[in-house]
Amino acid sequence: MEGNLISMREDHSFHVRYRMEASCLELALEGERLCKSGDCRAGVSFFEAAVQVGTEDLKTLSAIYSQLGNAYFYLHDYAKALEYHHHDLTLARTIGDQLGEAKASGNLGNTLKVLGNFDEAIVCCQRHLDISRELNDKVGEARALYNLGNVYHAKGKSFGCPGPQDTGEFPEDVRNALQAAVDLYEENLSLVTALGDRAAQGRAFGNLGNTHYLLGNFRDAVIAHEQRLLIAKEFGDKAAERRAYSNLGNAYIFLGEFETASEYYKKTLLLARQLKDRAVEAQSCYSLGNTYTLLQDYEKAIDYHLKHLAIAQELKDRIGEGRACWSLGNAYTALGNHDQAMHFAEKHLEISREVGDKSGELTARLNLSDLQMVLGLSYSTNNSMMSENIEIDGSLHGAGAKLGRRHSMENLELMKLTPEKVPNWNSEILAKQKPLIAKPSAKLLFVNRLKGKKYKSGSACTKVLQDASNSVDHRAPRSQKKISSDTIGDEGFFDLLRRFQSNRMDDQRCHLQGNCRTTSTAAASATPKLMKAPSVSVVSPNTDEFLDLLASSQSRRLDDQRASFSNLPGLRLTKGNSPSVLERLMTNDKKEPDEDFFDILVKCQGSRLDDQRCAPPSAATKGPTVPDEDFFSLILRSQAKRMDEQRVLLQRDPNRDSEFGLKELLQNNALLEFKHSGK
């Protein structure tokens, strides 16, 4: 009787487990179907429900982890994606599934790349590559090479972009990362070509072209993007075709072939309109506006910048609006329409204040100052020292010859404030005023050079600006407060400069977390309590207790980071039918870690230290209507280079230096002799 009862109980338990297994698998399959249909959020709900039900099948659970990680990655919840891909990796290693371990390592590497943990991502992707080669899995090897190339590309781009350098002018470590990406993409390309995978070839060509572009290899970038364009047309992939046209336009800009670049940007604009992507349409208009600025066709530049402005306003992209107003102000200035230029400069200033763009605010103020000088208006924040009796001589109208197109990016002459379309100034007045009418980009360069320096007083700032000025003023200064040699050195400018510097200092400060006691009595009372315990062990000659304490603390921290089978959600173990699974899990926990584990541990510890460092101020946010590859900075840099080329380098004469050094020595000796004789 008892035997029959035990048998009935076992049968009932089996049926319950069977229903649970079926329920878990059904939920997982429904989640997979929803994710494939594009509804990842609903799919995640079914996968989470499957995990709640649980399963004894480790391979099924591993597949659920992988799908959950991918779904969370698609939803941009990278912390959750990292968690489930880590569970998948742990489980795959536990059951000895090398193929599953390779895939989990690749997924983990992609997630770490997005989070900016590039060194850890490289370790994971390299593990994916090593296992694929061990298994002779060519498809997996190609995918691992592509992922590893993406990590190096992202690492180089991330470390190289914040600086003011030109494309291709990067530090050695950045160039090494980008070159490693090129090598990996080329290896991937040869492998997928042998496999006959045209879609993978297209992706490889696109990324290869982008990396060559960053390295400054613009001809190689053009070749790669042309191949990408060809494959995109084969598949009818309009989005990829549009990206290829845009990338080709960017490359031709830096080759100085502006006409060719404009043709590719027009094709980009056409496809963006076909795809009904308003943000990309605005980006194309913005790029075309800048291209025609480089071609000095300011009428067309204004037309495209106005289109960009309209779409930015439609999409409520204030950053894009500000950039459009800046560009329009420069173009109208070049045409001599200073009233319109003033309008857009004021709008640029207003938007820069609204979005907290201090650099844009400073640039807008300088542009307004320039335009007010041209129009003979008084400066809004201070009394201008420029007279309003400007004489205009009509006989000089049209005397200036229009500059031809320049192909060299080093010698561009753009955004003139006094083009030939404006009635020219009297030659004498023009000679006096022309040095004062500085280009916005030149002034911006000058202020950027001052950014990192400390100024002890306002007078010191004034002296630096006066020495650097090229302005001419024949009036003698009546007081120290009058600064007639440089109209930009006024109080409003210095107020802005001081605020700009203070904000930069605030961005570099560390913010203390938690409640801190600030009173001296509280600090005095708290200090002995805090220092009492460590003072005994540290000061004592016998530091064994301290080292034991440190070792135990470190071991607890390491234990917290270990993966245990009890922490795997959805894993159900029973005494009856899974002793082998439990034994494998326990055996896996007791294994001695290999050298690869310690390499990963060192990198992880290094990244944890990096996470505790003070991050630099974040880069300015870009709006959706401003393209990532914004070459408007090229216009500013070309202006800055022209200013640098006009500087005079003083050559030191060693004979003269020694002569002056001898004179100074003799004078000092004579002074000492005079003092001694007086005594």
From Swiss-Prot:
Residues annotated as binding GDP: 608, 613, 642, 647
Entry keyword Cytoplasm: yes
Pfam families in alphabetical order: GoLoco (PF02188), TPR_10 (PF13374), TPR_12 (PF13424), TPR_7 (PF13176), TPR_8 (PF13181)
UniProt entry keywords in alphabetical sequence: Cell cycle, Cell division, Cell membrane, Cytoplasm, Cytoskeleton, Membrane, Mitosis, Nucleotide-binding, Phosphoprotein, Repeat, TPR repeat, Transport
TPR repeat positions: 24-57, 62-95, 102-135, 142-184, 202-235, 242-275, 282-315, 322-355
Domain GoLoco: 490-512, 543-565, 594-616, 628-650
Region listing for Important for interaction with NUMA1, in residue ranges: 22-357
Gene Ontology annotations of biological process type: cell division; establishment of mitotic spindle orientation; maintenance of centrosome location; mitotic spindle organization; neurotransmitter receptor localization to postsynaptic specialization membrane; positive regulation of protein localization to cell cortex; positive regulation of spindle assembly; regulation of mitotic spindle organization
Record InterPro entries: GoLoco_motif (IPR003109), GPSM (IPR052386), TPR-like_helical_dom_sf (IPR011990), TPR_rpt (IPR019734)
Subcellular location: Cytoplasm; Cytoplasm, Cell cortex; Cytoplasm, Cytoskeleton, Spindle pole; Lateral cell membrane
UniProt tissue specificity: Detected in brain and liver (at protein level). Detected in brain, spleen, liver and testis, and at lower levels in heart, lung and kidney. Enriched in the ventricular zone of the developing central nervous systems. Expressed in proximal colon, ileum, ovary, Sertoli cells of the testis and granular cells within the cerebellum.
Annotated consequence of substituting residue 210 to F: Nearly abolishes interaction with NUMA1
Effect in UniProt of substituting residue 228 to A: Abolishes interaction with NUMA1. Abolishes interaction with FRMPD1
Transmembrane segments: none
Phosphothreonine: residues bearing it: 487
Phosphoserine modifications at: 408, 484, 540, 564
GO CC annotation: cell cortex; cell cortex region; centrosome; cytosol; lateral cell cortex; lateral plasma membrane; mitotic spindle pole; postsynaptic density
Cross-referenced Gene3D superfamilies: Tetratricopeptide repeat domain
Main localization, broad class: cytoplasm
Family designation: Belongs to the GPSM family.
Subunit structure: Interacts with the dynein-dynactin complex; this interaction is inhibited in a PLK1-dependent manner. Part of a spindle orientation complex at least composed of GNAI1, GPSM2 and NUMA1. Interacts with LLGL2. Interacts (via TPR repeat region) with INSC/inscuteable. Interacts (via TPR repeat region) with NUMA1 (via C-terminus); this interaction is direct, inhibited in a PLK1-dependent manner and promotes spindle pole organization. INSC and NUMA1 compete for the same binding site, but INSC has higher affinity and can displace NUMA1 (in vitro). Interacts with GNAI2.
Function: Plays an important role in mitotic spindle pole organization via its interaction with NUMA1. Required for cortical dynein-dynactin complex recruitment during metaphase. Plays a role in metaphase spindle orientation. Plays an important role in asymmetric cell divisions. Has guanine nucleotide dissociation inhibitor (GDI) activity towards G(i) alpha proteins, such as GNAI1 and GNAI3, and thereby regulates their activity.
Entry comment, domain topic: Each GoLoco domain can bind one GNAI3. In the auto-inhibited conformation, the GoLoco domains interact with the TPR repeat region.
Name this protein carries in UniProt: G-protein-signaling modulator 2
Native source organism of the sequence: Mus musculus (Mouse)
